[in-house]
């Protein structure tokens, strides 16, 4: 039975710019939406122009001082904020750029609205490719992330859902989400990521399992360089199957960071777009309400391909291998296909023995779980949001240029030899 899918897209979210040479490119969201539009996938979803999160919404997780700082700081006044910039870890990886707070408000509002719609059973699946910024902490920015829309979305889901499962397939450990829910059994966090050799953020060892009420409700799958589709699937499907069976979540949040693909500028895995998509399809197969978010992904053309393909899987619509013509068509040269070869020469350092050892440790930890912990009945606060559906029936009639504008920064896609990549001095 086909699911009702809600899709959140803000036409301005792709126009923000972290700065020259910065690997995080919000422009990838405009490319993704353009493909979703030109493949006709929007016809299979309810399309919303999302709510913009307020300071109050953000302070459901973050400290007031930190959010107040994000709202006030700008490139023109940042000299007066030296102490705060250091205190809140804003600077190199997380620069101050024009419209910073507005950018956070837009991607966070979409995740929050997605959670509210799932709570109110308006949809079965909610998609916000602009969200998934999993490194942000209560008191500080981290790893290109300022406001943790995932934590804020999960807090909204917890008003109605006794147990929320969070799954993270970004190449980086979902440290901000893990930290937020480390002491509770209401949220189980499961992160598959590269671990070791000082890889950012340096957390996510198998032995980080949660504490107090949350002991064993935190699960980490530390992987080595070069993991391919087959090895990843060998771990992902049995682990997620067991977790769902033991924990019995009433809602799932899936962070789909695309930096776990081969050929990512900051990544060292070897997943194909199909292999990445298979994880999304597998999570969908449990038929549990699902909030799907973006995350990392720094080879822009492949991020757009990946999230478009995953949108097609979520709406159960087969799409052609040849990309439809769009105003961004030249970005997808030379092949102009949905599934180019993204494999690299990086050797798969995840031996069968290593993967089996991880599996065994994880399954032993899962046996320690209290099956499906229950929650006392409580009063549910009123929803923070009232919102209007964007009637997208006229999307075909509008010219593509009316749907999104190109970013002002000419170097948004590639900055040449000075661009930061994995050899650079910016630690990712």
UniProtKB/Swiss-Prot annotation:
1D-myo-inositol 1,4,5,6-tetrakisphosphate binds at residues 17, 21, 25, 265. Residues 388-428 are annotated as: Disordered. Disruption phenotype: Liver-specific knockout mice exhibit low amplitude of circadian rhythms, dampened E-box-driven transcription and a significant reduction in the protein levels of BMAL1 and CRY1 in the liver. Its EC number is 3.5.1.98, 3.5.1.-. Keywords: Biological rhythms, Chromatin regulator, Chromosome, Cytoplasm, Hydrolase, Metal-binding, Nucleus, Phosphoprotein, Repressor, Transcription, Transcription regulation, Ubl conjugation, Zinc. Residues 388-405, 415-428 have a biased composition (Basic and acidic residues). Gene3D superfamilies: Histone deacetylase domain. Disulfide bonds: none annotated. It is found in: Nucleus; Chromosome; Cytoplasm; Cytoplasm, Cytosol. The active site is at residue 135. The keyword Transferase does not apply. InterPro entries: HDAC_PDAC (IPR050284), His_deacetylse (IPR000286), His_deacetylse_1 (IPR003084), His_deacetylse_dom (IPR023801), His_deacetylse_dom_sf (IPR037138), Ureohydrolase_dom_sf (IPR023696). The keyword Nucleus applies. Sumoylated in vitro. Histone deacetylase that catalyzes the deacetylation of lysine residues on the N-terminal part of the core histones (H2A, H2B, H3 and H4), and some other non-histone substrates. Histone deacetylation gives a tag for epigenetic repression and plays an important role in transcriptional regulation, cell cycle progression and developmental events. Histone deacetylases act via the formation of large multiprotein complexes, such as N-Cor repressor complex, which activate the histone deacetylase activity. Interacts with HDAC7 and HDAC9. Interacts with DAXX, KDM4A, HDAC10 and DACH1. Found in a complex with NCOR1 and NCOR2. Component of the N-Cor repressor complex, at least composed of NCOR1, NCOR2, HDAC3, TBL1X, TBL1R, CORO2A and GPS2. Interacts with BCOR, MJD2A/JHDM3A, NRIP1, PRDM6 and SRY. Interacts with BTBD14B. Interacts with GLIS2. Interacts (via the DNA-binding domain) with NR2C1; the interaction recruits phosphorylated NR2C1 to PML bodies for sumoylation. Component of the Notch corepressor complex. Interacts with CBFA2T3 and NKAP. This is Histone deacetylase 3. It comes from Mus musculus (Mouse). The lineage of its organism: Eukaryota, Metazoa, Chordata, Craniata, Vertebrata.
